[in-house]
Amino acid sequence: MGLFGMMKFAHTHHLVKRRGLGAPAGYFTPIAVDLWNVMYTLVVKYQRRYPSYDREAITLHCLCRLLKVFTQKSLFPIFVTDRGVNCMEPVVFGAKAILARTTAQCRTDEEASDVDASPPPSPITDSRPSSAFSNMRRRGTSLASGTRGTAGSGAALPSAAPSKPALRLAHLFCIRVLRALGYAYINSGQLEADDACANLYHTNTVAYVYTTDTDLLLMGCDIVLDISACYIPTINCRDILKYFKMSYPQFLALFVRCHTDLHPNNTYASVEDVLRECHWTPPSRSQTRRAIRREHTSSRSTETRPPLPPAAGGTETRVSWTEILTQQIAGGYEDDEDLPLDPRDVTGGHPGPRSSSSEILTPPELVQVPNAQLLEEHRSYVANPRRHVIHDAPESLDWLPDPMTITELVEHRYIKYVISLIGPKERGPWTLLKRLPIYQDIRDENLARSIVTRHITAPDIADRFLEQLRTQAPPPAFYKDVLAKFWDE
């Protein structure tokens, strides 16, 4: 899932940065967690080590480890579920739904040229009460008999591939335990989880998204790949834009071709293929050093950069990317930079030789960052209340030709959908972006114990996990208090 080849490209070109994400004392860093994606990664990692554990036991083992790390690193997770909190909502928005709807409408490329390129309104763009969040079942409501969110009798190990055992992830069980423990969560309803994560990021609700899906980068988010390491590998969207020397609208319009969910049967392009078609070359080390020096010595000027030339009408095609990127590489255009540099970016964001906690350049266990420095960096990070808002996302449509094929129609619709998720709306003098509702149930440890003992029948295993939850997952703070302290103080 995600952008094909982006993860490999990011590692090869050193765009995966090691950051501490340390918050000042008394603060928690809010982070959106794509629950299925994160738990899938952990279960695949640990289920081989514990072959005797059933689905619920291995899921709870991974969840205990996850919650322990969140507590140790002062991270405040907001869990985003797939297919609603009951795991039964049909997904009618997002990349997969756009592809399915478009291919059902159009049988040939000729038909695609006559179809409206607008996707259906999402729960975020529709001003009416949304049905996507209407089927919330509050914590403690009993499930139908036999409903466990499992694959049923078909979950046996496939005989043809013994090296790849069936995934033992009890997603619904995981959600119910988290709700009983009082953690904040998003009921994505009919949205895909990564779309809900992008909404949390661009509404300045969370500072990062914890996922390995690189399509979040296409939606302009900064992602965390793994929080269990001593350092935390992250990929910042702005780092990629600087490296590619392009604006976000260009990035969205160009790399939508790499989105695997939009292009079935291996019809997607890889990141390397797209860059090769554009004759893009990576910056030399001397260019990188000069860029870092300029960032350290330049004042935070707000003067506007000369805009990129508008796309030609009617005849615009992807071939024009070659000329545009060639001129950018040659210095003809400056890369867009509307907001101040993020102090958590690659250079640390602070002028002068002083080290920063943003990117760890020495072994993590040797890094001792004073709390005063953490507080200064935090205040600098949240100084601009609109730092995550992307105002120019609609310009991506200017870089696309009119859709003439099914593939181009799918890409066009998806970009419009992304704009509806992350692009603010003008309402007179106000700029508005609707945030998905956040829920947080009252912590009920008795209910958590009941859920665990009902699904994990071995008393010793259940008691061990319950003790871990009691000691390693203390009651989380109220999400409104955490967000107000992080963003407003």
Curated annotation (Swiss-Prot):
Top EC class of this enzyme: hydrolase
Subcellular location: Virion
Record's compositionally biased regions (Polar residues): 124-134
Alphabetic keyword roster: Decay of host mRNAs by virus, Endonuclease, Eukaryotic host gene expression shutoff by virus, Host gene expression shutoff by virus, Host mRNA suppression by virus, Host-virus interaction, Hydrolase, Inhibition of host innate immune response by virus, Interferon antiviral system evasion, Late protein, Nuclease, RNA-binding, Viral immunoevasion, Virion
Annotated phenotype, changing residue 392 to N: In strain: HSZP
BP GO annotations: symbiont-mediated degradation of host mRNA; symbiont-mediated perturbation of host translation; symbiont-mediated suppression of host gene expression; symbiont-mediated suppression of host innate immune response
Additional facts recorded: Strain 17 is relatively weak regarding early shutoff compared to strain KOS. Strain HSZP protein is non-functional for host protein shutoff.
Entry similarity comment: Belongs to the herpesviridae VHS protein family.
Assembly: Interacts with human EIF4H, EIF4A1 and EIF4A2; interaction with eIF4AI and EIF4A2 presumably allows Vhs protein to associate with the eIF4F cap-binding complex.
Protein name: Virion host shutoff protein
